[in-house]
Amino acid sequence: MSYTDIPAGNAIPDDFFTVIEIPANHSPIKYEVDKPSGQIFVDRFLSTPMFYPANYGFIPNTLSDDGDPLDVLVICPYPVSPGVVIRSRPVGVMYMTDEAGADAKVIAVPHEKLSSMYSNVKECSDLPALLLAQIQHFFENYKALEPGKWVKMGRWGSADEAREDIRKSVAAYNLKKEASK
């Protein structure tokens, strides 16, 4: 099955699906889903001995500014296995730039239907400051030992900005899909 068979969500932008590629607190291995086949490949072994501080994946059937599906970090109490789809809701967005250009990461929590643990979290600022610092530190440093690769942190955006980024990425995907017919 291809991940293009999975819709972006139930009620975009507040209830979306995230395909997990890398579990939280996992070994320093960067996995990527091959979108057409649905297979999970090892993209590379991170040169820095660091692990992703949250479950990392993407929203299917989206297209972000970097030409890939929109990236998501899902904050939850457990690592989620690669290839699993989790219902998510946005609480913010992290704007950054890397060697390939602009690269936004939606910050999300599990949808209320999955867990009430995060029902009080409406914005990134409702998350622990240490967790946000860990996320920022990870992305600012995880490419540091890879020649030609770099990341520059921009700013944290609101849940409303994340929702707008999700809407835009769904629209961009649909536009590209229509143009290819």
Swiss-Prot record:
Homohexamer. One of its GO terms (molecular function) is inorganic diphosphate phosphatase activity. InterPro entries: Pyrophosphatase (IPR008162), Pyrophosphatase_sf (IPR036649). Keywords: Cytoplasm, Hydrolase, Magnesium, Metal-binding. It comes from the Bacteria. It is an enzyme of class 3 (hydrolase). The lineage of its organism: Bacteria, Pseudomonadati, Pseudomonadota, Gammaproteobacteria, Pseudomonadales. Its EC number is 3.6.1.1. Substrate binds at K30, R44, Y56, Y142. PROSITE patterns: PPASE. Its cofactor is Mg(2+). It catalyses: diphosphate + H2O = 2 phosphate + H(+). HAMAP family: Inorganic_PPase (MF_00209). Catalyzes the hydrolysis of inorganic pyrophosphate (PPi) forming two phosphate ions. The keyword ATP-binding does not apply. The gene is ppa2. One of its GO terms (cellular component) is cytoplasm. It is found in: Cytoplasm. The keyword Hydrolase applies. One of its GO terms (biological process) is phosphate-containing compound metabolic process. This is Inorganic pyrophosphatase 2. PANTHER family: INORGANIC PYROPHOSPHATASE. Mg(2+) 1 binds at D66, D71, D103. Belongs to the PPase family. Mg(2+) 2 binds at D71.
